Amino acid sequence: MDFRRQTLVSNGGSSQPQPSVPSSAIKKASRLGPARQSLAPSQIQSRTSILGVSNSQENASHGMMGSRKSTVPGKMGDRDQLMSASRGDGGIYGRTPQMNRGIPGSVRRSSVFTSNSQGRTSMAPGVYSTAYKDPRPLRDKVFQSNCMRNVNEYLISVRYPLPLTAKTLTSPTAKEFQSIFKFLVNDLVDPGAAWGKKFEDDTLSILKDLKYPGMDSVSKTALTAPGAPQSWPNMLAMLNWLVDLCKALDNWDDPEIISDPLMVPATELPLDYPNLDDRLLWDFAAKTYSQWFDGEAEEFDEAEQELEHAYGKSYSIVLNDTEQATDRMASATVAECEKLEREIQKRNVEIQQLHVQEVCSPITDRISFADKSYKPPLKKLEDEYVQLMSDKNKFISFLDQQGQKIEKIRLRISKVKEAVISQEAELEARQSELAHIEQAVAAQNLSPDEVQRMNHERDSLTRSLEDLRNKISEASQFAYDQEMVVTKSMDRFEGLLTDYNSLAHQIGLLDFSLDVPSLAANVNYNLDVDLGAEELEEVKAVGVRMRSTIWQALQTCREMFRQEALGLGNGTIALEDEFDKLGQSVERQKEEVGNLEVRLKIVHNQAEDAQSQIASENSDTNKIITQLETEVTNMLAASQQGVLSTQSQLESTRIAFKELRHKTALFQDSVVAEVGEHIDAIIKAKEHTANSLKSIRALAETQ
């Protein structure tokens, strides 16, 4: 037994390091609120709705229908890249709100106090070393169209209570997206699920619980403005994934669709299913146990008949398969014999032909001697046949290639004809338009000077319009750049705020259940910043409070904690010295305890020997009683006349048994008394040892 001091933190257990902060500290639900609205003009052209909800086609403008309306297209990965690229921990805190996820040691802040020894290296695998790449083509129009169609058809089939318009699945508002998401989650997870005040936090938690593979593409900014052009493809793919889960859940119990062998009755499983006998036995035991537990029956004839029927059916199937296999083997053998007979006949014919050629062998020998390239007629015909078949196959492949070329040429010709027809129609339209314009000009009766002046004004207006377009483009680009800078700053601030909340929870500044230092108890360390506020004075006021009040209070707390840690370190050194002294005294007492344990073991062995002797005597007595009862039974069966003598002998035997049992009880009492005395002696020895240890400890404390 090792009495050396051990650390309170176990090195074993879970291989995943657990954070020392509460789950609410990792991502506090800060009231960032909706972000500011962009003043940049829209550069995105409206597109035609591809949903088949209405017969008419409407132009759905791509804009932000939520609180923050970003009018400039952006990349979906910018947010996550900025969060992970600006700092090492940005991707962790920004992507896992309110989750008790283990934070790697590489992103934790190192202590301001020096340590005497380095801690052991963590053996946990790097969870954040590799990023999952979504293989789905989220930006593909065809993929988006299929997702919209799938979501729309499912919502209609399950009677979605709210109306579906043409813009619902092309550029929805935040309210529409939240309604669809809540409807799918309530249908899939829990119909009575409770939703908190922060829809974004609940959504991220639910998707993480459902193990959504594209969690990196779902952020709070995207959930706040789901209808934005840079956010909607990812949100649409996520809704399509939820719809597929709902469909799979609806078909979970359909025997025509599922293929899970655990949900199929054992009698319908194939014979080659592994552990079929165990499955039949398990079903039989489960069915009969439920009947027995309910008290319905003690015998299970119906279940036994079903089990016998299942085994009989399996045996009949095996027998039928064996017979069919035998028949197939017999038929195959007969066919093989017939084939061999035909082959023999063919070889016999060839032998006859060779015999005929041997009759003409002198002539053949002279020809072959004169011409080395001479071949027998049969061999020559076979070579010619092989060559002709090869030419035939080549010609067929050539015809196929030419047919494919003809089809391609026909398609090209049809496309050219269509282009020619469209060009002719356009030319006719332009000619008619030119004639109409010439008639209008002729009707106006304009002079050449007026025409020249109008052309000059048109050129000047065109140049002015082009200049305005260039200025608008430059202003839009500048607004886009500024908006990207603001977005990056907001994301970086969100990550820094998360770090601040986590560290504040660790030292107890935000957890009011802990003891807050007296110097910092009157300071509110909670940061509630609304970056989406219209008035910038509120944000500036929070910044002033951060620099003036909170920063000074944190410096004071740091100095106080440093002094406290220094005092605790000195106290720890003193306690370690005292602990070493006590350890030496305990080692001496351990030797005495070991001697007492040896004595106790000897006493236990003696008690066990006595118990074994008593058990052997009891077994002998039981054997005698059994033998006597057997003799009594035989005597009763042999003759009725010996009943009286047998009863008298039985009475005498019972009296002897009672005396023997009485003696056994007395002996047991004596043994128990001796064991009790030994136990009392052991208890007294332990009490004496404990009192000695207490006196030694008191003496050590006084010294």
UniProtKB/Swiss-Prot annotation:
Kindly list any coiled-coil regions of this protein: 326-358, 407-479, 573-616
- InterPro entries xrefs: Kinetochore_Ndc80, Ndc80_CH, Ndc80_sf
Question: Main localization of the protein?
Answer: nucleus
Biased-composition ranges, Low complexity, are 9-24
Which purpose does this protein serve, as stated in its record?
A: Acts as a component of the essential kinetochore-associated NDC80 complex, which is required for chromosome segregation and spindle checkpoint activity.
Partners and quaternary state?
Answer: Component of the NDC80 complex, which consists of at least NDC80, NUF2 and SPC25.
Annotated protein name in UniProt:
Probable kinetochore protein NDC80
Q: Which gene encodes it?
A: NDC80
